[in-house]
Amino acid sequence: AEVCYSHLGCFSDEKPWAGTSQRPIKSLPSDPKKINTRFLLYTNENQNSYQLITATDIATIKASNFNLNRKTRFIIHGFTDSGENSWLSDMCKNMFQVEKVNCICVDWKGGSKAQYSQASQNIRVVGAEVAYLVQVLSTSLNYAPENVHIIGHSLGAHTAGEAGKRLNGLVGRITGLDPAEPYFQDTPEEVRLDPSDAKFVDVIHTDISPILPSLGFGMSQKVGHMDFFPNGGKDMPGCKTGISCNHHRSIEYYHSSILNPEGFLGYPCASYDEFQESGCFPCPAKGCPKMGHFADQYPGKTNAVEQTFFLNTGASDNFTRWRYKVTVTLSGEKDPSGNINVALLGKNGNSAQYQVFKGTLKPDASYTNSIDVELNVGTIQKVTFLWKRSGISVSKPKMGASRITVQSGKDGTKYNFCSSDIVQENVEQTLSPC
């Protein structure tokens, strides 16, 4: 079967759109009137209330604050969501703090609240509506598609892909925020987001556990030029309950990255395990990309597809973290079992204590680990060492750090600190530069 709509073209329910193992249920997209795609324009001049613009009525665009000399960023929500939800306009507001931009929140709640199998077909109409608006801007107002960036969450990521594909990949950038897995993973490129949909495609994966049995809603498949897997792509810190917490974190990371880009450096790495074992450190000579809003500043961004990056984030607030590699060489009287902790004292502030090692503590041995610190301490001036025993014993041995080496992930700078002190457990020892 096939259904056609005036300015949007025709839609079929033949393969690969339906009747495949990934898409067993055959259905056509709903009527565009029912889906009722709306474009809510926010700009630096109207940050708190939107102007409704319509592709079929160019007068609405000309009468609005849409500025032809600025970039345009579309934000597209996902399943069961709405374009008037606060997270979309909040993202625009963060952008207005760092740039002048046309920020268009795309509302398709008339199509997103259907059953999932139907909603996944409805995005084809929404993608066509977005593409049509970009075409109108291009043909009627001479506005170049490469100035367009489409950000989509969940089903919205594949909606962005559909729009980009219809514009022959001429859109400047697409960002996929945890693209939806069911009905899209392992499907042909024309059905889902893929790197050919824009000049640059970057993706943040936060919920890659399988849909069955874990209810992981996001794709594990790499679908961009650059695919970021914060915290390995699943089980986000601070997400205790609720099936949507991990899936929604991709939005929160992007939102924070607009104002805190340096706190989301992605390390190129083959796997999260390798990253966690202190591999893939420090950043390469050309630097690490910034996950989120400023990923497009990375020099090698489109050198290859499926470039893979890992990082760890915080559990709340702005989620930023700064990664360091720490090596502690111990001195002391005997080898109790316990843990050793280090804090960094820098020009911009002091970090909390981070555990470097837990186990048998042997004098003269060295222990190395990577830590993700909650603030950018700047140039490191001192470090503190603290050890704690596990278990109880009558004797009170003393241990110390004779040397602590700290390396910054961002630029590879190494700092060396020394001391000849030894301290009892729970007593802080300060080390100065050697």
UniProtKB/Swiss-Prot annotation:
Enzyme class: hydrolase
Subcellular location: Secreted; Zymogen granule membrane; Cell projection, Neuron projection
Tissue-specificity statement: Pancreas.
PROSITE patterns named in the record: LIPASE_SER (PS00120), PLAT (PS50095)
EC number(s) given by UniProt: 3.1.1.26, 3.1.1.3
Pathway annotation: Glycerolipid metabolism; triacylglycerol degradation; Glycolipid metabolism
Active site residues of this protein: S154 (nucleophile), D178 (charge relay system), H247 (charge relay system)
Residue ranges that the Swiss-Prot or TrEMBL entry lists as coiled coil: none
Catalytic activity: a triacylglycerol + H2O = a diacylglycerol + a fatty acid + H(+); a 1,2-diacyl-3-O-(beta-D-galactosyl)-sn-glycerol + 2 H2O = 3-beta-D-galactosyl-sn-glycerol + 2 a fatty acid + 2 H(+); 1,2,3-tri-(9Z-octadecenoyl)-glycerol + H2O = di-(9Z)-octadecenoylglycerol + (9Z)-octadecenoate + H(+); di-(9Z)-octadecenoylglycerol + H2O = (9Z-octadecenoyl)-glycerol + (9Z)-octadecenoate + H(+)
Region feature Required for galactolipase activity, mapped onto this chain: 76-88, 240-244
Glycosylation sites: N318
Record membrane topology: Peripheral membrane protein
SUPFAM superfamilies: alpha/beta-Hydrolases, Lipase/lipooxygenase domain (PLAT/LH2 domain)
Keyword set, alphabetical order: Calcium, Cell projection, Cytoplasmic vesicle, Disulfide bond, Glycoprotein, Hydrolase, Lipid degradation, Lipid metabolism, Membrane, Metal-binding, Secreted
Disulphide linkage map: C4-C10, C92-C103, C239-C245, C269-C280, C283-C288, C418-C434
SMART domains in UniProt: LH2
Reported regulation of activity: CLPS stimulates triacylglycerol lipase activity. Not inhibited by bile salts.
Gene Ontology CC annotations of this record: extracellular space; neuron projection; zymogen granule membrane
One MF annotation (Gene Ontology) recorded for this entry: lipoprotein lipase activity
Residues in PLAT domain copies: 322-434
GO biological process: galactolipid catabolic process; lipid metabolic process; phospholipid catabolic process; phospholipid metabolic process; triglyceride catabolic process
Function: Lipase that primarily hydrolyzes triglycerides and galactosylglycerides. In neonates, may play a major role in pancreatic digestion of dietary fats such as milk fat globules enriched in long-chain triglycerides. Hydrolyzes short-, medium- and long-chain fatty acyls in triglycerides without apparent positional specificity. Can completely deacylate triacylglycerols. When the liver matures and bile salt synthesis increases, likely functions mainly as a galactolipase and monoacylglycerol lipase.
Homology family: Belongs to the AB hydrolase superfamily. Lipase family.
Protein name as it appears in the record: Pancreatic lipase-related protein 2
Organism of provenance: Cavia porcellus
Top-level taxonomy: Eukaryota, Metazoa, Chordata, Craniata, Vertebrata
Gene responsible for this protein: PNLIPRP2
